[in-house]
């Protein structure tokens, strides 16, 4: 005789498995008050994350404590309003910042760029932890990191100009991702082989969703280190390099 089928989980049980807004219920033709207030709060947190200040000095001190020579630069975006209205300015170095890079160590394997992006709070919360886990992994395979560059008003492509100025074979950009309603502090890592102005997203690999409820700093560093090593060996990133790093995460229990 066959054993009885396992009953399906209730919607309430499913809700505990995801921060996504599912099975919220209703009150008449609208949402219940609790769900509506929760949505409003999440939206406010996402907006605050975009407009939060970026403490480049604090990030610089944290990276220097890890033994990394660290420089500070800015994009051509004069302020946050400029940054949001003119994405193109966030992809270009401000002239005096270019002069800062001209005096830095050249011809390195990897240049690390930490940029505020669209969520400075994500950078403050996650970036140093990712770097802390990443450095020994790169050192273990004899991949050198020259300097870390902390960039204010940064878009992802700013790393291309920074990497080119440093003569780096590859650039790794850790940057705040666009805040979501369930993840206002998510960090992304973008890797580009042969960085230079004019490259597109097709030339990059991305490790995204790095935050407390997503990919951990250790897991992200594992993936980044694998992509860096393989990218340098194959002399390619982006669509030419598939992430086959595997996972450090434990397997989910079988139902």
Curated annotation (Swiss-Prot):
What's the catalysed reaction?
Answer: ethanolamine = acetaldehyde + NH4(+)
Q: Which organism is it from?
A: Rhodopseudomonas palustris (strain TIE-1)
Q: Can you tell me where the transmembrane regions are?
A: none
User: Which Pfam families does the annotation name?
Assistant: EutC
What is this protein's record name? Ethanolamine ammonia-lyase small subunit
What are its GO biological-process terms?
amino acid metabolic process; ethanolamine catabolic process
Which EC number(s) are documented for this chain?
Answer: 4.3.1.7
Pathway involvement of the protein, from the record: Amine and polyamine degradation; ethanolamine degradation
